[in-house]
């Protein structure tokens, strides 16, 4: 059974459009999680393809300073895995959502209960950046009968043989990491990045989205040439926190990208 997230993104591809995923931090709002529905509606109205939602964690190894600070603000609003799932169960959206979480919060929740409870939400994908491929079976068997896709991250330093291993069981999409390091570190792309992404795109059977450091319309154009779309996090998280209204025009243009 092909997962809903894969089908949704493949439909966007067939329409000749670039896939655009904004990242937001759950609970990073003056109303805490009570503001989540408002933020999702704002993004949905701008035409985004799906939305990645971060669950805050006290030791976020993959997060740059902007997202780390957003996580701290969210924790200050007492956001937890339980409270996020409860909020998502009340949410009305047509968009598939993806949760990006470290392993510890969902382990504390109970993996089986977490997967079961997400079945009553619009969440269709999971990204767990600190779960090694070799340990994927901690959660993968629980997803077999669910509509949740476990999304792999493929870095620049991943060799071809390892890439093939990572993507052969992948569902939803492939998260191609554009930089070595943490999120939000823009302007320091490797010279062979486009070639790396193009090769990954050639061997993947599901959409490949480029993230980490993507922050300009030039980036959006560049990475839509060599992958199926982009994920933008730090730029959006910062703008939402600062109430920078200009972010709407950026999101709308990036989300409307035509191949």
Swiss-Prot record:
One MF term in the entry's GO annotations: tryptophan synthase activity
CDD domains according to UniProt: Tryptophan_synthase_alpha
Protein name (database record): Tryptophan synthase alpha chain
Keyword Flavoprotein: no
Associated pathway: Amino-acid biosynthesis; L-tryptophan biosynthesis; L-tryptophan from chorismate: step 5/5
Role summary: The alpha subunit is responsible for the aldol cleavage of indoleglycerol phosphate to indole and glyceraldehyde 3-phosphate.
Organism per entry: Streptococcus gordonii (strain Challis / ATCC 35105 / BCRC 15272 / CH1 / DL1 / V288)
Keywords: Amino-acid biosynthesis, Aromatic amino acid biosynthesis, Lyase, Tryptophan biosynthesis
């Amino acid at each position: 059974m092909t997962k809903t997230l894969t089908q949704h993104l493949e439909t966007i591809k067939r329409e000749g459009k670039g896939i655009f995923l904004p990242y937001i931090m759950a609970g990073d709002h003056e109303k805490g999680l009570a503001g989540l529905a408002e933020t999702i509606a704002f993004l949905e109205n701008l035409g985004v393809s799906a939305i990645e939602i971060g669950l805050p964690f006290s030791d976020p190894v993959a997060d740059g300073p902007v997202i780390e600070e957003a996580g701290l603000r969210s924790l200050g609003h007492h956001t937890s895995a339980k409270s996020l799932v409860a909020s998502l169960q009340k949410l009305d959206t047509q968009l598939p959502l993806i949760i990006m979480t470290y392993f510890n919060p969902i382990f504390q929740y109970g993996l089986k209960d977490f997967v079961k409870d997400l079945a009553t939400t619009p969440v269709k994908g999971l990204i767990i950046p600190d779960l090694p491929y070799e340990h994927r079976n901690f959660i993968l068997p629980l997803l077999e009968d669910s509509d949740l896709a476990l999304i792999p991250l493929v870095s620049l330093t991943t060799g071809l043989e390892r890439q093939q291993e990572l993507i052969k069981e992948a569902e939803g999409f492939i998260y191609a990491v554009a930089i070595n390091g943490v999120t939000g570190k823009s302007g320091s792309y490797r010279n062979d990045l486009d070639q790396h992404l193009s090769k990954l795109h050639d061997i993947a059977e599901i959409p490949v989205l480029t993230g980490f450091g993507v922050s300009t319309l030039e980036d959006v154009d560049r990475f839509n040439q060599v992958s199926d779309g982009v994920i933008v996090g730090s730029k959006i998280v910062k703008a939402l926190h600062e109430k920078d209204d200009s972010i709407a025009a950026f999101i709308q243009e990036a989300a409307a990208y035509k191949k």
